[in-house]
Amino acid sequence: MISARQLAFLILRDINRRDSYTDVAIDRALQKHPLSPPDRRFCTELVYGVVRRQRTLDCLIEQLGDRPIGKQPPDLRRIVQLGLYQLRYLDQVPASAAVNTGVDLAKANGLKGLSKVVNGMLRRYQRAEEQGKNILDQEKISLGEQYSFPDWLMELFEQTWGKAETESLCAYFNQNPSLDLRINPLKTSRVEVAQSLAELNLTTTAMAGLPQGLRLGGKTGAITQLPGFAEGWWTVQDASAQWVAQILNPQPEETIFDVCAAPGGKTTHIAELMGDQGQIYAGDRHGWRLQKLAVTQQRLGLTSIKIWEGDLTQPGVKPPVELVDRALLDVPCSGLGTLHRNPDLRWRQTPATIATLLPLQQALLKAIAPLVKSGGTLVYSTCTLNPAENEAQIERFLQDHEDWRSEPFEWTSPQGQTNSVTSGMLTILPHHHHQDGFFIANLKKA
């Protein structure tokens, strides 16, 4: 059987050679090479960890190696990154194991002649650690190198939150994400789900302000194998995302339009909040993503959702409904609030890619506005912490649409404190609230 470290190396090589998304590459490899649950967790930790800490690890390699990193074979770099990640960040791995398995990986993957290079760099780092020396001089390296983020992103965060907040935020983004469930009240209760998971020695915590929310702790294994998944008792959804439908506050028998609905987490939440009574139109321009929504809808036993494939921003496209009571616009965004959950986003997004999202977000706001009834509600949400995609978009929309205004709402923090969001715009900060970074705006039509 293939080892967890060997599979982690193959996945990292796949990501490098094919520009694969991390989660896709991991799923593909684990389907081909099934591992035991502990090895599966270790392999996943190694891959996500190396992708997250890539820039910091490369700084270490520059200090430890005799050749510039750009002149080293990519496969050698991956093997050394794996070894350094274990030495620097995984206390449970003995240093000797991290070094010796790194040498073994080099020999097993066509780099036998460079195995001494791997051994030399890893042992050099190990000796420095044992002597209490910090190879990375905190005064000489940038914050981006220290926390493993691109400089442009650090500058964006510093301009928005300041240096101290940025360091706390980036430290949070380098941790493993929490796992939150949303209980389906049409089939079960939070207590029943918690009891079924407790039998597997999994801990659960009810989340303040979220009647359907349950935070899961412990070694879960494959999510789809947990009790209640196949039965539609629950679905995975971060606490921040659960707030979106709650703020929309849909009522039974209303007509709702979820404009960018796939893969369906918020759509199905809307249906649950309405008791599956009403008309919910779930739109998306990608049919393959809507197929995922259909699967989730069926698993949860919901019948009030009607799927519509289309793009409201395109000329001549007829919407699936003329007027709605409420609309949800969870726009395509840069995802900068989920960098702990999607570590490769920090390397994929650039100021240029974000610039292409801004006109799309504006066009979607403009397209949905006429479809909401007078007195109706529009909730705009993103999972980013970029003000240009958040507050700036809402301020521009309100300037251009005098018949719309921000609507205050109440929000309960994870600490259980309920506050009135008088501006109608909420930013959830990961390092303060221990959940995904989100922006939610509540808008009311005159």
From Swiss-Prot:
It comes from the Bacteria. Belongs to the class I-like SAM-binding methyltransferase superfamily. RsmB/NOP family. This is Probable ribosomal RNA small subunit methyltransferase B. The active site is at C383. Gene3D superfamilies: NusB-like, Vaccinia Virus protein VP39. S-adenosyl-L-methionine binds at C260, A261, A262, P263, G264, G265, K266, D284, D311, D330. CDD domains: AdoMet_MTases, Methyltransferase_Sun. GO terms for cellular component: cytoplasm. It catalyses: cytidine(967) in 16S rRNA + S-adenosyl-L-methionine = 5-methylcytidine(967) in 16S rRNA + S-adenosyl-L-homocysteine + H(+). Specifically methylates the cytosine at position 967 (m5C967) of 16S rRNA. Keywords: Cytoplasm, Methyltransferase, Ribosome biogenesis, RNA-binding, rRNA processing, S-adenosyl-L-methionine, Transferase. GO terms for biological process: regulation of DNA-templated transcription; RNA methylation. It is found in: Cytoplasm. Its EC number is 2.1.1.176. GO terms for molecular function: RNA binding; rRNA methyltransferase activity. InterPro entries: MeTrfase_RsmB-F_NOP2_cat (IPR049560), MeTrfase_RsmB-F_NOP2_dom (IPR001678), NusB-like_sf (IPR035926), NusB_RsmB_TIM44 (IPR006027), RCMT (IPR023267), rRNA_ssu_MeTfrase_B (IPR004573), RsmB-like_ferredoxin (IPR054728), RsmB-like_N (IPR048019). It is an enzyme of class 2 (transferase). Signal peptide: none annotated.
